[in-house]
From Swiss-Prot:
The keyword Heme applies. Heme binds at residue 450. GO terms for biological process: terpenoid biosynthetic process. GO terms for molecular function: heme binding; iron ion binding; monooxygenase activity; oxidoreductase activity, acting on paired donors, with incorporation or reduction of molecular oxygen. Keywords: Heme, Iron, Metal-binding, Monooxygenase, Oxidoreductase. This is Cytochrome P450 monooxygenase tpcB. PANTHER family: CYTOCHROME P450, P450, PUTATIVE (EUROFUNG)-RELATED. Its EC number is 1.-.-.-. The keyword Nucleotide-binding does not apply. The lineage of its organism: Eukaryota, Fungi, Dikarya, Ascomycota, Pezizomycotina.
Length: 506
């Protein structure tokens, strides 16, 4: 109040000059503190990241987060400060330190980018974002029932059903000589699969366009969420933060989400009791662990698991086809393996596909090059500790960047190229004896590792094997779309495509 009274006694010119001087002083203080006095001032990184969220906002706005973070690590080393209160690591040792032992809650999900984004879109914490380790453990135990070997076996007929439903469209494309965006077809196919697996019936059938609108809204909000993450650790910004929260919450993301699965339809699924081991039934079993989920928590967990599982699996499915089609020798080897392993399409099963070495090598190599989770989705809030010989004060946001680690020459021979041979038994004879296979952990490790990874891999195997058994695919223009150059990356990959010619094989 005294400052305001003082300013009121000045002329307009003096008021402007004084306000400018105060602004310069405050800005200079922020810069000096961030660069020289902050507890993380010893960590190297870009100048703007030392005192502002601008580096992260810009990388997210450009949709080049993965490649730009990798470039930072190449410039500054394995430990990089990417925001005033955030550090990214690019070593296997750091990855193990952050994620391997999480049951004590020392490295928490609280305050991370993904948790904040989820809070803005959903009305309750989910298995993916819940910070309490004890609560997470109990919820994980019940939801795990949807991903047991028994559950996977029961899910296979549903996966095959939706694959078969897509076949007439591929047949027509092949017969008429059309070309298609294979990525779009694959995503639509898996959308129908996971909707059925999640809710016990095709509850989301035909609603992928609604999800795509939601995804575009989410993509546009990423820079603002990055700014909010920065503001969370600043003193005295609560009113501004709440205003920003209200603004983001007012965006139509939540309304689009409710269109995917209306609450009345969800209640019908809850009341249906047919013994199916779907995601919804698993969540309903939470009461067996003494957990009582209200309607918001129930809906949030169902949608969180479904959409996270859909996007990561659909991306890996498309990117595996992308790599196989670009590397023609790998394509020929894979087709030969699949077509010689079975006498009839009916013999194609998840159990037998899990034993095909080259198919699984192609999937593993794709996951190494393009892990579905990156630094933003894998953030943790650290305790006071030392990681990779670097002191980290309590409350710092930390992550290990899988994209950079899994493409590092420190761990892999010829790391930027697609070499499925590196995952075969005779890899050492083929020149990959310098690989450290344990450095590829695309599903993360520890208690927060991806719960649906086996379901995802089974779906990918079944779809790829069925399509390559029936059809031959060829890229329209092998250099027309380059994933690393043209796809967007933030929390997820976006804007990828796969234009192909399709021919019947038999």
């Amino acid at each position: 109040m005294a400052v305001i009274s003082l300013l009121q006694g000045l002329s307009v010119g003096q008021q402007i000059g004084t306000a400018a001087a105060i602004s310069v002083f405050v800005l200079t203080s922020i810069v000096v503190y961030g660069c020289y006095l902050h507890p993380l001032s010893h960590v190297p990184g870009p100048f703007l990241a030392k005192f502002s969220p601008i580096w992260g906002m810009r990388a997210l706005y450009r949709m080049k987060f993965n490649s730009e973070l990798q470039a930072l690590h190449e410039k500054y080393g394995p430990v990089v400060r990417v925001a005033p209160n955030e550090v990214s690591f690019a070593t296997l040792e750091a990855e193990t330190a952050i994620y391997a032992n999480q049951e004590d809650g020392r490295f928490s999900k609280a305050g991370t980018f993904l948790t904040l984004f989820s809070d803005l879109v959903l009305n309750a914490p989910t298995l993916i974002t819940i910070p309490d380790p004890a609560l997470h453990k109990r919820l994980h135990k019940v939801i795990q029932q949807a991903f047991t070997p028994q559950a996977l076996a029961s899910q296979e007929p549903i996966q095959k059903l939706h694959i078969e439903k897509a076949i007439p469209d591929f047949d027509e494309t092949a017969d008429k000589g059309y070309h298609i965006d294979l990525a779009d077809k694959l995503e639509t196919m898996f959308w129908e699969i996971i909707g059925d697996l999640a809710f016990g019936e095709p509850l989301m059938a035909g609603k992928r366009p609604t999800y795509e609108k939601l995804k575009q809204l989410g993509k546009g909000s990423m820079p603002m969420v990055e700014a909010l993450s920065f503001m969370l650790v600043m003193p005295g910004v609560a009113p501004t933060l709440e205003m920003a929260r209200s603004f983001l919450s007012a965006m139509p993301m939540s309304s689009q989400l409710s269109k995917l699965v209306p609450s009345t339809k969800l209640r019908d699924c809850v009341e249906r009791k047919d013994g199916r081991e779907d995601f919804l039934s698993a969540i309903m079993g939470s009461e067996k662990q003494g957990l009582t989920l209200d309607a918001d928590a129930f809906f949030s967990n169902a949608m969180g698991l479904t959409l996270a599982g859909y996007q990561t699996t659909a991306t890996t499915l498309a990117s595996t086809f992308y790599h196989v089609l670009r590397y023609t020798d790998a394509y020929k080897t894979l087709c030969t393996e699949i077509r010689s392993a079975f006498n009839d399409e009916a013999e194609i099963t998840g159990e037998r596909l899990a034993r095909l070495p080259f198919l699984n090598a192609c999937i593993r190599e794709t996951l190494r090059l393009l892990p579905p989770a990156n630094g933003k989705t894998a953030q943790r809030t650290a305790p006071s500790c030392t990681i990779a010989d670097t002191y980290i004060p309590a409350g710092t946001i930390v992550s290990a960047d899988l994209y950079t680690i899994q493409r590092s020459p420190k761990y892999f021979v010829d790391p930027a190229r697609f070499h499925p041979e590196r995952w075969l038994e005779d890899a050492e004879k083929n020149g990959f004896n310098g690989d450290n296979r344990s450095a590829s952990r695309p599903f993360l490790i520890g208690s927060r590792a991806c719960i649906g990874r086996h379901m995802a891999q089974q779906s990918i195997r079944l779809i790829m094997a069925t399509l390559l058994w029936r059809y031959d695919f060829e890229l329209l223009d092998p250099d027309g779309f380059i994933w690393e150059r043209d796809a967007g990356s933030s929390l997820i990959y976006t804007d990828y495509k796969l234009p192909v010619h399709v021919k019947r094989f038999q």
